[in-house]
Amino acid sequence: MDLGTLQLRQSNRKVLKKEMIMSVARERIVDCNSETFSQNFNRLPHEVHHALADHPLFQLPALAALAQQVANRKNPHHPKGDLYCDQGIETNGSHAGLRDSRASIAELVREIEKGKTWIILKHIEREPGYREIFENCICDILDLAGKDVVKSIKWFEAILFITSPNRVTEYHIDRECSWLLQIHGNKDIHFFDRADKDVLPDDELERYWVVDNLSATYKPEYESRALVFHLQPGAGVHSPVNTPHWLQNGDNVSVSLNINFQFHESEWENLFKANYYLRRSGFRPASPGRRPLVDRAKSHAYSAVQTIQRRVKGLPSVTANEARQDYYRIVEMLASRGPR
């Protein structure tokens, strides 16, 4: 064999090895038909698929340990802690044990099948192992959405839901743009059109953005308008900002991972805030979208007032340092990834 042939074969081996490495690196956790995704991103709910159903970090023993880690955080993201636990016990009309003792949370996870419990673990991306999964999920999603979307994002989060059989999650709306990935068990999620004013009137959205996270009210007479997704392990669904929904767990333990991000204050958000104060002052503001020029003026005026208030009060205009570090790390990861 001459030297030229040998060098060519060695070069081919290097190219093949590089292609294999890139192929492994591009193996996706979250995926969806690109056309479906681009048409519906932050507009309409749609199904996605994921590869986490058999991952060891999402088995109950690992989740019990994770719950204990989250409960014991010395610097939680939220002032009241990053763990929420509702055991479905009512005393005199109010829920008891909404935030269970830190000592018993791991046991609650292990015994989840026997109760009526709903456990939420927030910002699990702060824990080793889960961080890498979360970052890859976000990068997969942003590959589909278009990498420029990251410029409009304020922060990212991974939330884990562990739910007892047959538990219902009440009707609500969220300010985050999210993807719910079903890992264990099955559940139905009922979505409603956020543009349907019968289902979600303007005043409910206005109160939501300003004073009341629970302002959205379920109206059973419109249940027939719901778009229902039946989630099994390996399936997921996209929930656009402010899309009303409620969930019904199946007759088994459900483990769901919610990958979400929150956009910077948008004209849309500020418009509802401006309309809230106008309505309180006795005006009857037009629904967003009917008078675009007026909408834009109100939104910009509200944004300017908020900026002045932040400066007067000395409030930060960016999120916590750790959240910003997560953001920049994801931006770097996106830049290093090749095309789909």
Residues covered by each model-derived region:
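A gly/proline- and charged-residue-enriched helix-loop-helix capping module
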Residues: 126-160
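Ligand-binding loop in jelly-roll beta-barrel domains
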Residues: 230, 243-257
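Transition-metal
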Residues: 16, 20-139, 278-283, 309-310, ...
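Double-stranded beta-helix
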Residues: 182-238, 243-244
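Conserved double-stranded beta-helix
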Residues: 228-231, 263, 267-340
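Conserved short histidine dyad/triad with adjacent acidic residue
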Residues: 159-173, 192-196
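A short beta-loop-beta micro-motif enriched in histidine and acidic residues
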Residues: 155, 168, 172-178, 224-225
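A short hydrophobic beta-strand segment most commonly corresponding to one strand
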Residues: 202, 251-268
